[in-house]
Design a protein with these regions (language model features):
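Left-handed beta-helix
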Residues: 25, 30-31, 36-37, 42-43, ...
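Short, Lys/Arg-enriched N-terminal segments with co-localized hydrophobic residues
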Residues: 1-11
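C-terminal segments of enzyme domains that contribute to small-molecule binding surfaces
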Residues: 12-25, 30, 82-90, 94-95, ...
């Protein structure tokens, strides 16, 4: 099925072990993104150029209005589903592996989040941060470093910026679908 307005596009959307990705018709998937297996994308989500989403070991869910920017890798292990809430931004080159991301979170460019980690809503994970296995990040946190640590509480203005960024990417995805 072509998710980009009837253009002849060779997406790498593949069935694996009888699991075919379920992608809402309102989603944008870049031409060279790869989505395999047990993956669900909710309304207005987007996956950008060069990203790989492999639901070959367990389920991956990308919430409504969330965006997976260029060259990201999303993967799982058995018993480590990957769940991304609503209006989440996953910055360029980030790696998410078997973790849970609540609503309205910004994952900075190049950040790595490992199995069993849980990121609370309205949080920012700084660029290049390493969130280790099973780490629990409380909601409203700003997190940086390798290994990651909470450095302060997010401001109302920063929460608004997270929301605005997610809305911007939802609109951008609609524009790209029209190209």
């Amino acid at each position: 099925y072509n998710y980009n307005k009837g253009k002849e596009v060779k997406h790498m959307i593949q069935t694996y072990r009888n699991h075919t990705p379920r992608i809402d018709a309102t989603c944008f998937v870049a031409d060279n993104a790869t989505i395999i297996g047990d993956v669900t994308m909710k309304a207005d989500a987007s996956v950008w150029f060069g990203s790989v989403i492999r639901g070959d070991k367990d389920h991956i869910e990308i919430g409504e209005g969330s965006n997976i920017q260029d060259n990201c890798t999303l993967h799982t292990d058995p018993q480590h589903v990957l769940t991304i809430g609503k209006h989440v931004t996953v910055g360029h080159n980030a790696i998410l592996h078997g973790c849970h991301i609540e609503d309205e979170v910004l994952i900075g460019m190049g950040a790595i989040i490992l199995n069993g980690a849980h990121i609370g809503s309205h949080s920012i994970i700084g660029a290049g941060a390493l969130v280790t296995e099973h780490m629990q990040i409380p909601k409203n946190s700003i997190v940086v470093g390798c290994p990651a640590k909470v450095i302060k509480t997010i401001s109302a203005q920063q929460i608004q910026e997270i929301q605005d960024n997610a809305m911007h990417y939802a609109q951008l995805g609609k524009e790209y679908k029209e190209m």
